[in-house]
A protein has these predicted regions:
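A metal-dependent, Asp-based hydrolase signature
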Residues: 27-61, 71-79
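Helix-loop "lid/cap" segments that line or gate small-molecule binding pockets
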Residues: 11-12, 32-45, 101, 130, ...
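Substrate-recognition "cap/lid" segment bordering the active-site pocket of phosphatases
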Residues: 95-146, 160-173, 179-180
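Active-site neighborhood of HAD-like aspartate-dependent phosphohydrolases
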Residues: 1-27, 41
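Short, acidic loop-to-helix structural element flanking the phosphoryl-transfer center
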Residues: 61-89, 95-99, 128
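Conserved donor sugar-nucleotide recognition element shared by glycan-biosynthetic enzymes
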Residues: 4, 33, 69, 124-127
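Short beta-strand immediately N-terminal to the catalytic nucleophile in serine-hydrolase-like folds
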Residues: 90, 175-176
Length: 181
């Protein structure tokens, strides 16, 4: 989260706003940045978009590397993969940064699916949209591996696909670090 909060500070500084309250800065973690700049610092739409550009200016080169993994997460992911579980990442970080982050932390080999948010204007900007895309990709992955799911998903019956999605959700474990996850 340090990469995010420092990049938010950088963006605000570029707009002449000083913010040192860590609690305020941490509120930016998760929701779309343009919405957060408007909500937490009262920026106009135009200034919020400028702030997002400033944020990314710093984040893409520096902030992306100022984060850390939770203790034991590599071992957990390795164990889950060895046990044959499908592992997926749903993050509100823009999808364009996801491969770099996974590679930097040397964990890309542990994920079957990794989905991030889309940039401004994209349909997938909130965490629930990202999670739904993960489930859609799990369905596709299962279709390739499981004839029963393939047969049910290939029908035009929406309730069959909904049943499959409910089964996948029931068998899923999600780990998050905030109430938004």
């Amino acid at each position: 989260s340090e990469g995010i909060t420092k990049s938010v500070q950088y963006a605000l500084d570029k707009l002449g706003i000083t913010e040192n309250d860590e609690a305020v800065l941490k509120r930016y973690i998760g929701p779309p940045l343009d919405e957060s700049f408007a909500k937490f610092h009262g920026l106009s739409r135009e200034d919020a978009l400028k702030a997002v550009n400033y944020y990314r200016e710093r984040y893409k080169d520096t902030g992306i590397y100022e984060n850390r993994l939770f203790d034991g997460i590599k071992e957990l992911l390795s164990s889950l993969k060895k046990e044959g579980y499908i592992t997926a990442l749903a993050t509100c970080k823009p999808e364009i940064y996801v491969p770099t982050i996974l590679k930097y932390f040397d964990i890309e080999q542990y994920f079957d699916i990794a989905v991030g948010s889309e940039l401004e204007g994209g349909a997938r900007r909130h965490k629930d949209d990202v999670i739904n895309e993960v489930f859609n990709q799990i369905i596709k992955l299962n279709k390739a591996d499981n004839a029963d799911i393939t047969n049910a998903s290939d029908t035009t019956n929406v309730s069959d696909t909904a049943d499959i999605l409910n089964d996948i959700k029931a068998d899923s474990i999600m780990v998050g670090d905030r109430k938004d996850d």
